[in-house]
UniProtKB/Swiss-Prot annotation:
Domain (Sigma-54 factor interaction) ranges: 218-461
Source organism per UniProt: Escherichia coli (strain K12)
Listed InterPro entries: AAA+_ATPase, Homeodomain-like_sf, HTH_Fis, P-loop_NTPase, Sig_transdc_resp-reg_PrpR, Sig_transdc_resp-reg_PrpR_N, Sigma_54_int, Sigma_54_int_dom_ATP-bd_2
Entry annotated with the keyword Transcription regulation: yes
BP GO terms, sorted: negative regulation of DNA-templated transcription; positive regulation of DNA-templated transcription; propionate catabolic process, 2-methylcitrate cycle; response to radiation
Protein name per the record: Propionate catabolism operon regulatory protein
Keywords, in A-Z order: ATP-binding, DNA-binding, Nucleotide-binding, Transcription, Transcription regulation, Two-component regulatory system
GO cellular component, as recorded: cytoplasm; protein-DNA complex
UniProt-listed Pfam families: HTH_8, PrpR_N, Sigma54_activat
UniProt GO MF annotations: ATP binding; ATP hydrolysis activity; cis-regulatory region sequence-specific DNA binding; DNA-binding transcription activator activity; DNA-binding transcription factor activity; phosphorelay response regulator activity
Keyword Transcription in annotation: yes
Function (record text): Involved in the transcriptional regulation of the propionate catabolism operon.
Amino acid sequence: MAHPPRLNDDKPVIWTVSVTRLFELFRDISLEFDHLANITPIQLGFEKAVTYIRKKLANERCDAIIAAGSNGAYLKSRLSVPVILIKPSGYDVLQALAKAGKLTSSIGVVTYQETIPALVAFQKTFNLRLDQRSYITEEDARGQINELKANGTEAVVGAGLITDLAEEAGMTGIFIYSAATVRQAFSDALDMTRMSLRHNTHDATRNALRTRYVLGDMLGQSPQMEQVRQTILLYARSSAAVLIEGETGTGKELAAQAIHREYFARHDARQGKKSHPFVAVNCGAIAESLLEAELFGYEEGAFTGSRRGGRAGLFEIAHGGTLFLDEIGEMPLPLQTRLLRVLEEKEVTRVGGHQPVPVDVRVISATHCNLEEDMQQGRFRRDLFYRLSILRLQLPPLRERVADILPLAESFLKVSLAALSAPFSAALRQGLQASETVLLHYDWPGNIRELRNMMERLALFLSVEPTPDLTPQFMQLLLPELARESAKTPAPRLLTPQQALEKFNGDKTAAANYLGISRTTFWRRLKS
């Protein structure tokens, strides 16, 4: 479908689609973003929304749609416009449960497609009777609500459809989405539209692709982290390609952005300040056919559905700056060959094109894979490895930075409590210190990301039920992962995709998360 052309000074066009109380939240939050985008609310759902939007798209442009739950999934499977799905965060779920817990101890939680296994710990800690259900269709949701009503449930936590059905049935409905989560969806939609429209104006895109992290964000005072920071400063003296190696959650993109910032800070000090984009792509999260067009761009008519006038690829967008290739070990072999040629020739030819475009780009790549093993197995080109790894940076796992674990836990807990307007007391600091053995004993397979997420969860518990006695036993009750016996080697590396799939009873999303890879990569490995 041909959409109306975009003018260079146009703001992104975003439509919000909802049929329940989410409509009002959309309306309120959209006021905070109306200076950044043209936002139109659509109060329809499912097939009525699809029919209306398709008709509207015949004469109007839309860059992104924001929706939620089963309605959002329905739209995403039937529309060509990108649909940003709002997903409740851990904060949203626990805050809704805390609100429901003040009303009754008999609570139902009804979520789209899947239940939430992590709520088992919450149920035990606060002595609540949680009845978790999932649904696919509206009829399915109505059936789940009726069963909860028959079982004596008094309050139901869920999306707008669920809370409306619960209140129709005479129960209390607790809305699961927070304003913060909706704001994040608007931010994601803006980021996505900026990326998809970058071919129209490189300068505007460069301004939108600034780095978020600096060297000071590499937290930790251990000798290992001091060595990492010193290495980053050293690599900032060179424009050579860098390969960052480390487990999932060790901060590979953070390190890449720090190298970018430090290098161009030195560069601009000598030659004058300029715009230097930092462009990132996850090579394992995009299908091979799409990744080729994303990296190298395409000409008009290169394939069905290609944009009029073609589109610049990430190499062109990153000209004068840095291209960060995350999970480079997941890149398919045919694209590895083409990437090698671009790196050697310093020019790129768009898909369907014939004219090479010179590019001046520093490439920083990252992987959690064992590339040496992949090269031996023929999954990764050795010549490309040598081209990408002129400089190498190894990020240590958290279990090897034991001196950093307690200070990081305290820092993350402070930030998380502050976000909830809750104080960090001396008693909490003492409780963390008393729980140091528990924290140090855990293997931290998710590294920094896992520690931060745990402290966010702990903060939410503490904001609901403040306790002056944060004991190791209480920590293990709230964070059951800490009670498990740590293995010397991270568990994900011990399982094949098939074994992980069996471990999680066929749940592909859970298996991919456990292995620390995307669903696309999981499928690719499962088939190989």
